[in-house]
């Protein structure tokens, strides 16, 4: 698939068609950190289950279970006798509360870094969100500078755009990023509370059912794995969500502060993630131009934001006609999309 070459008057062109927001490295670092934390959770839960061995005793009479495998006609093949050991556990209300307390402390410490459930100032996940957010601010400013040619937008606007600084302190951006932190922390807290109930029920139900330590350990490990999958999904969704949110916020600010009385306005050029895992209706948007409201509505519906690797970039358009100033870029992107579809048969 042919890549689109970066040209001075174009917005920032993705280096990888599969990773248009250039967040692959950031995502990987976040995934590695989450994996380490869930490995510690799994190890601690395994030890918690093993600790229940001291409260375990084999039932006085093992239960005998008889079953007969049948063929496709319902006829018995032969008799199989299964002799399975059942256990009973001495578990008091205090012991039950102790198990719940241990699980809550473990999960809150590893995933929230807070025993109160309140977001700490230096929550570990903030670094990945801030990295994505700040990348988007820089990309948006650079795209705006690339497109603001004096011969097109005029000397005054071109000069104002050139003065934009991604590193300048901006209280609006600080507040917006804080809101991103809070939203994602609440999502992770929801996952943590759900896991707390799930792991506690899996452990205590296994004990009540008379299962052995090995079986309970396996069941608990499966539930930890489910939690890890959910955490990964939150990670992918929210890091890219932070990038897209920052890009829209900065584009909107530039429109209001600089382009408000201009015959031009910056809209949203859609860069789809041209990857096998991308949903067809996401790929279809590659090279299309949308308003920021249209983009926000799309991501608010039908789980479209979940695991989405697409990104958008500001694109300079004529306010009256809605046509892009860089028509050749739009043409190249649509050709790129058609070539990718032909190559993968979609």
Locate each region found by the language model.
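N-terminal leader/targeting and assembly helices and adjacent pre-domain segments
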Residues: 1-223, 319-346
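Acidic, glycine-rich two-metal-ion catalytic cores of nucleic acid-processing enzymes
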Residues: 225-226, 230-331
């Amino acid at each position: 698939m042919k890549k689109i070459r970066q040209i001075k008057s174009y917005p920032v062109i993705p280096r990888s068609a599969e990773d248009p927001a250039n967040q692959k490295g950031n995502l990987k670092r976040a995934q590695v950190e989450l994996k380490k934390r869930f490995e510690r959770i799994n190890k601690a839960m395994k030890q918690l289950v093993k600790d229940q061995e001291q409260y375990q005793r084999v039932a006085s009479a093992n239960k005998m279970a008889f079953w007969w495998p049948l063929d496709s006609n319902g006829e018995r093949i032969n008799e199989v006798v299964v002799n399975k050991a059942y256990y009973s556990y001495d578990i008091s209300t205090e012991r039950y509360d102790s198990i719940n307390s241990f699980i809550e402390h473990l999960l809150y410490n590893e995933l929230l870094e807070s025993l109160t459930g309140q977001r700490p100032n230096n929550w570990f996940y903030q670094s990945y969100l801030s990295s994505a957010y700040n990348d988007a601010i820089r990309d948006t400013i650079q795209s705006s500078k690339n497109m603001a040619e004096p011969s097109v937008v005029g000397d005054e606007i071109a000069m104002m755009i050139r003065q934009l600084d991604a590193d300048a302190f901006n209280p609006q951006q600080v507040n917006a990023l804080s809101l991103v932190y809070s939203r994602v922390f609440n999502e992770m807290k929801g996952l943590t509370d759900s896991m707390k109930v799930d792991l506690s029920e899996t452990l205590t139900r296994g004990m009540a059912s008379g299962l052995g330590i090995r079986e309970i350990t396996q069941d608990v490990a499966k539930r930890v794995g489910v939690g890890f999958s959910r955490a990964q999904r939150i990670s992918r969704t929210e890091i890219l969500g932070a990038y897209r949110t920052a890009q829209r916020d900065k584009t909107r600010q530039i429109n209001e502060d600089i382009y408000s009385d201009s015959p031009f306005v910056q809209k949203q050029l859609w860069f789809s993630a041209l990857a096998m895992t991308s949903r067809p209706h996401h790929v279809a948007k590659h090279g299309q131009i949308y308003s920021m409201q249209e983009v926000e509505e799309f991501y608010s519906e039908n789980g479209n934001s979940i695991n989405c690797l697409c990104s958008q970039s500001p694109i300079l358009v004529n306010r009256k006609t809605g046509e892009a100033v860089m028509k050749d870029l739009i043409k190249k992107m649509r050709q790129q999309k058609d070539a990718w579809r032909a190559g993968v048969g979609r």
